[in-house]
Amino acid sequence: KISKCPNAVMKVGGAQQRVGAWEPPFHNNLRQSPIGSTELCDLLYERYIYAIEAFGPDRCMFESNFPVDKECVSYRTLWNMFKLVAKRAGLSTSEKTAVFSRTAQQVYRLN
């Protein structure tokens, strides 16, 4: 319902972090080695694309919750995963610009 409101935007991120006592299966505490961006994308793609499809790329912005996310995934891995999500979704150059920068610039009035 919120996506139907034209002034609502979605910060797309956070699906990889711990929630209360629940730890995602890729949490660093549960792995022999850190997760890579491709594996993370495979696990979380459906969650992220759901938001992008509901709101549209022009009302979504990728975001991180660093330093909180650090316990689950590296900063580099997270942003590389976002690049893979955009590629897998077939986002155009303009749509990629929206989710990686333009939406945030508009929402936070950074222009």
Language-model-derived ranges and their functions:
Residues 1-61, 106:
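Catalytic pocket-lining loop regions of alpha/beta-barrel enzymes
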Residues 10, 46-50, 54-61, 70-111:
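Mid-to-C-terminal alpha-helical segments outside catalytic/metal-binding sites
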Residues 18-21, 69-73:
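Short catalytic/ligand-binding loop motif for oxyanion handling, primarily in non-cytosolic enzymes
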Residues 65-66:
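Active-site metal-binding loops of divalent metal-dependent hydrolases
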